């Protein structure tokens, strides 16, 4: 392959990678690829929400360190991150459903905002090199009700609790990057996708 394929192929080899929400659909596919690329994967998630789940169907539990913890529990998240000191963190743990957010707005906001805040606070308090990628959603942008592809320069917003919580998660990530990581030599890179 070309140089880009070689670099990408080896970037996760023998690296410790934390994936929150690893039992969900996207998290399960991400873990599958990370294992294939040679990563040492640590997962933090609740029980899978479907039965059977992709996580179970792919037989991933035998290939990773699997924690079943609530992302809102700061002390548990802190212990896991301190113990494993991941070189990459992919944050996918979320309440991901728009319709559920109408029935459970408090849970939606607490999971999607405090989960992000908890991980970033651990990184702020403890010095080690890592890359943090916060997976949000195109729903984090203000809904213009037009046929339009959103881009990262669009205004954040949200007409429903889920969308608003994802916009807040983007703002929290940006705030931590600007306030604590941008001009420090702690070797923490932060981004959202």
Q: What do these predicted ranges mean?
A:
Residues 1-193:
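N-terminal Rossmann-like NAD(P)+-binding domain of SDR-like oxidoreductases, especially those catalyzing
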